[in-house]
């Protein structure tokens, strides 16, 4: 993996295939001797409360890969959002996040019912936020109460911008201590957290990595639009109807990343085209 940032806009794709993000997670955890980190959710289900969450982690085999830390198990803390944020002043994250000196932010790029798509920025915002922090993001700063947020959701644009602002808080906190990897395989219009996701329609695209999460998400979005419309139409529609790409615009405006990038293939072959196919 190259570490040349090309003015923070360098993007390295890998045309290797991966069957699951868990496979990549296992390799990264073992080679780096790191922990897998997680936070409790803000919606009902087995991952909202720590005891049930730990059982879910065990049931899905993650304890066999590495130590799993639920970062908001014992406490949470606020970190400042970037200057220019319009909805959030502080992001509320799991307190154990501060225990780490470096981060591999591993994402399964796919669609998402609320965010349009889930990639690095969604993982940095919703994934790192505590239960109360997730409520804060979903409500665009109106409440930290997970029991109240779902009955009074803000305009979609405000939610998308709140995700960008929360992600910016985490990126600013990490500084240059992070690398971002997105696995584009089994692309459904729904998130992995959905109990009944729509079957994947897009074939594997590959694995992309960058030191810039905004560039990484932009490249993944571009590769969806460069794919055969017969298989990518549903995901395109999901991203557009949820205003998903707007997170890229707001993140770039906040100054912690850039949408410009260049693709470089690790095996020396010609990188895939990102020219839109209609």
Task: Give each language-model segment a name.
Residues 2-3, 8-9, 15-20, 28-39, ...:
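Extended, low-polarity segments enriched in aliphatic/aromatic residues
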């Amino acid at each position: 993996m190259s570490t040349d940032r090309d003015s923070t806009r360098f993007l390295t794709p890998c045309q290797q295939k991966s069957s699951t993000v868990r496979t990549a997670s296992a390799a990264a955890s073992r080679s780096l001797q790191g922990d897998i980190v997680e936070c409790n959710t803000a919606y009902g289900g087995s991952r909202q409360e720590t005891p049930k969450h730990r059982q879910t982690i065990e049931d899905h085999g993650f304890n066999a890969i590495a130590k799993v830390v639920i970062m908001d198990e014992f406490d949470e803390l606020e970190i400042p959002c970037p200057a220019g944020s319009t909805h959030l002043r502080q992001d509320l994250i799991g307190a154990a996040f501060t225990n780490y000196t470096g981060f591999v932010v591993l994402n399964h790029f796919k669609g998402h019912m609320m965010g349009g798509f889930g990639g690095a920025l969604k993982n940095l915002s919703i994934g790192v936020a505590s239960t109360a922090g997730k409520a804060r993001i979903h409500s665009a700063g109106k409440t930290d109460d997970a029991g109240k947020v779902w009955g009074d959701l803000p305009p979609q644009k405000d939610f998308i911008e709140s995700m960008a602002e929360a992600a910016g808080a985490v990126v600013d906190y990490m500084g240059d201590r992070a690398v971002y990897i997105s696995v584009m395989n089994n692309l459904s219009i729904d998130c992995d957290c959905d109990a009944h996701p729509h079957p994947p329609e897009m074939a594997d695209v590959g694995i992309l990595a960058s030191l810039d999460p905004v560039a990484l998400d932009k490249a993944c979005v571009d590769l969806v639009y460069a794919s055969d419309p017969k298989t990518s139409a549903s995901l395109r529609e999901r991203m557009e109807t949820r205003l998903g790409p707007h997170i890229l615009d707001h993140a770039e405006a906040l100054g912690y990343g850039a949408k410009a990038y260049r693709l470089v293939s690790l095996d020396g072959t010609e990188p895939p085209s990102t020219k839109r196919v209609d």
